[in-house]
Amino acid sequence: MRLLHTGIRMNVKKIRRLMKQNNLFCPIRRENPYRKMARDMRTNNVAKNIVNRHFLDYGMRKVLLTDITYLYYRSGVCYLSTILDACTREILAYQLSNNLRVDFVIATVEELIRQHGCTLDNTTIIHSDQGCHYTSRAFIEKLRDADFVQSMSRKGVCWDNAPQESFFGHMKDDIRDEISKCQAYGEVQRVADDWINYYNNDRYQWDLLKLSPKEYYRYLSTGIYPLEQYRGSRGSAPDPEV
């Protein structure tokens, strides 16, 4: 069009050939493929906010929070999907992916079932935001097949999924520098694996009575407090349904 307005008439194919020969590129932005994917996946299937920020009222393995975060490394970006027990703060399942297709979110649910299926039932709630992955037919059908209850935050209200958001914040604070130095996707996977293993087993939290998430789960399951020998170290424990 610019040439036409200056009085020059030229075939489009010739223009493209000359641009290629001179390494010229059109500055017009191309559509983000993930935005198109999000539009294609999005449905009107928004679940009720059953949890409504009552993260601890149901007990362990009853309210499971899920979300996706971006991890930027030297060669690009990858995506982490996690499922967190709102009561014990354990990461029960996670998947890393180099793309945002819905498959890796469904794979996270499948890992949850493989690893913890015997502790879950038809009262287990999977709570998420209203992202296109969680409103997709594939995800909804996966939860329905597993006999889980689906719950969603209100649109744009991050506090409705606060423990999951907090987990991502702490994780990124700890590993951001290390991730930024990673050259390959496999290196990011190793860093994520190591940190989540550390978090579940060795990251002690005041809100969990100075225990790690896995220790806290065992304490709630057995009633045996591992720090009982240290006088005054025990706080008042919540009384979730076990």
Language-model-detected regions and their locations in the chain:
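Basic, flexible linker segments flanking DNA-binding modules
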Residues: 1-59, 157, 212-222, 227
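Conserved, non-catalytic sequence blocks in retroelement Pol enzymes and Pol-derived host proteins
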Residues: 5-8, 56-57, 73-74, 129-130, ...
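Mobile genetic element proteins and their domesticated derivatives, centered on retroelements
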Residues: 15, 19, 51, 67, ...
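RNase H-like polynucleotidyl transferase catalytic core
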Residues: 28-34, 125-130, 144-163, 179-184
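An active-site-proximal beta-strand-loop segment
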Residues: 53-92, 98
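Active-site beta-loop-alpha junctions of metal-dependent nucleic acid enzymes
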Residues: 76, 95-119
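Acidic/histidine-rich, metal-coordinating catalytic segments
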Residues: 118-135, 209-213
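C-terminal domain-tail junction helix/linker
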Residues: 137, 144-148, 170-242
